[in-house]
């Protein structure tokens, strides 16, 4: 009987089991060759070896599948691709790039669009959706044995059968066949065939499209660093190599699809929110005067990785005192001072989805009278906003009704300073408390503000906030809202927000209590 090389690791185990299974045991004659091992057993041992071989092969396949996502069934990816087929028609194709492979020893993270359509997390892959015959093909590079030996399993075109089983695509082809296959679609001979591909920049890791576009704009403004985006280069290549195709933007369709989350997506976002909440609670417990902002970051990251996150969904915003006044303060280099508030806005990248939760609390563990009045206003505003969220309404309608409630809330209320009263009155006029979608990116694609009708499956943040420029004081909390069939659910409601709950959590022991670390102030730029 001939046994291929992948059984080598269990030869010894098999012989031991055979020895126990038979009274008379003869040491097998093993002849080593460069690529295979020939083992001759007596006939009565054959069936036992065959059974064990099948078990081992099953284990190997299970290990290979470990490198593929387990959050979504094949049917969900197929349904997403079917929606694209329905929209582009039979005289068009859609072509989607994966993220490129990463240099050095960085961990690869797939682009959100590519992952959304097939779940595959390998670089330099292409997904072709042929509207003419409604078939789907994945194009992948060939196996790099040296890289696999160093890094572990990497799915390649040689794993075609496994990839078809995992993703539900019709075919898996070598990447060098893509050009000929575009011709082979037969559409080029037709009348004005269309090729759809995303024009918008691909999000990976802790990126959001709006921030990527800001980065592109800054680079374009630099006469020494003007860059062409990867998407623009891809579109240019398509136009040069296949001028017969009219190239159109697939991003608007993908954005509308991603705006409405499935039940499975909401499950993953819920888990990401739970991890974010636990991380913020750990940061609360680790807070005391003299602790550095970066130590709260470390406490939160510990919770992220402890619960299986692959990193952060966006850079942590942790600002003590006046640092919080900067809405996206990322440096985290200052010490936390007695009497100040500290704001944390942070969530993980969990299975390619994230969350967006913010809390603010007193460094010394107790809100003073001035802080209490302003903070309770923010709590009341959050409650008023959630009160009116339901299917069929709009953000503008929610904002109008909540603002009316807050005008009533202020009747009879007093604040310590005129600047504080002015801030809360301006807060009622501010239209940004109803914020942005959240999903695969923290500032996810699609729109929920203005006159967009809310639908079940939309996930976004409710983020009431006020600024007091005279004191460089900024106060806000942020929660995760998901529209249900009957109303709304606050996914982050469990994260302490009531004053008594926040103060109680701060008093609990945290990481910096039982695992003290020397605070090394970072050098400021």
Where are these regions (language model features)?
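Short hydrophobic targeting helices and cationic amphipathic motifs
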Residues: 7-8, 13, 33
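Bacterial N-terminal signal peptides that target proteins for export
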Residues: 37-48
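Active-site neighborhoods and metal-handling regions in enzymes and metal-associated proteins
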Residues: 41-42, 60-525
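Bacterial N-terminal signal peptides
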Residues: 49-57
């Amino acid at each position: 009987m001939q046994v291929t090389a992948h059984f080598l690791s269990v030869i010894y185990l098999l012989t031991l089991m055979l020895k126990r299974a038979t009274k008379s045991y003869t040491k097998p004659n093993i002849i080593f060759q460069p690529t295979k091992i020939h083992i001759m057993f007596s006939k009565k041992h054959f069936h036992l070896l065959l059974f064990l071989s099948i078990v081992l092969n099953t284990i190997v396949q299970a290990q290979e599948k470990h490198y593929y996502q387990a959050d979504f069934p094949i049917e969900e990816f197929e349904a997403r691709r079917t929606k694209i087929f329905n929209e582009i028609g039979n005289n068009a194709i859609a072509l989607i790039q994966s993220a490129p492979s990463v240099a050095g020893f960085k961990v690869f993270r797939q682009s959100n669009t590519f992952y959304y359509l097939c779940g595959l997390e390998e670089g330099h892959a292409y997904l072709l959706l042929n509207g003419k015959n409604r078939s789907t093909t994945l194009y992948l590079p060939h196996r790099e044995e040296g890289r696999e030996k160093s890094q572990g399993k990497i799915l390649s075109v040689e794993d075609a059968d496994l990839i078809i089983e995992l993703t539900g695509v019709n075919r898996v082809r070598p990447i060098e066949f893509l050009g000929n296959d575009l011709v082979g679609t037969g559409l080029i001979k037709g009348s004005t065939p269309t090729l759809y591909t995303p024009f918008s920049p691909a999000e990976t890791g802790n990126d959001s499209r709006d921030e990527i576009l800001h980065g592109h704009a800054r680079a374009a403004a630099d006469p020494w660093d003007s860059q062409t985006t990867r998407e623009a280069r891809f579109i240019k290549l398509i136009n040069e190599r296949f001028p017969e195709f009219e190239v159109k933007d697939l991003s608007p369709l993908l954005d509308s699809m991603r705006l409405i989350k499935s039940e499975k997506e909401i499950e993953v976002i819920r888990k990401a929110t739970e991890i974010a909440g636990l991380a913020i609670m750990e940061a609360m417990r680790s807070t005391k005067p003299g602790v550095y902002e970066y130590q709260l970051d470390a406490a939160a990251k510990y919770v992220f990785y402890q619960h299986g996150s692959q990193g952060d969904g966006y850079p942590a915003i942790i600002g003590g005192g006046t640092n919080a006044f900067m809405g996206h303060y990322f440096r985290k280099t200052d010490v936390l001072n007695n009497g100040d508030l500290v704001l944390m806005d942070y969530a993980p990248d969990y299975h390619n989805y994230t969350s967006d939760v913010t809390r603010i609390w007193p460094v010394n563990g107790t809100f003073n009278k001035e802080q209490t009045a302003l903070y309770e206003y923010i709590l009341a505003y959050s409650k008023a906003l959630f009160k009116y969220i339901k299917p069929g309404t709009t953000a503008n309608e929610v904002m109008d009704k909540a603002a009316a409630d807050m005008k009533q809330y202020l009747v009879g209320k007093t604040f310590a300073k005129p600047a504080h009263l002015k801030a809360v009155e301006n807060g009622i006029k501010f239209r940004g408390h109803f914020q942005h979608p959240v999903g695969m990116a923290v500032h996810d694609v699609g729109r929920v503000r203005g006159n967009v009708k809310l639908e079940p499956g939309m996930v976004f943040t409710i983020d009431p906030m006020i600024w007091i420029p005279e004191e460089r004081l900024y106060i806000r909390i942020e929660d995760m809202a998901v529209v249900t069939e009957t109303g709304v659910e606050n996914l982050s409601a469990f994260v302490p927000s009531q004053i008594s709950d926040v103060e109680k959590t701060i008093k609990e022991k945290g990481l910096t209590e039982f695992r003290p670390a020397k605070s090394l102030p970072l050098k400021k730029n």
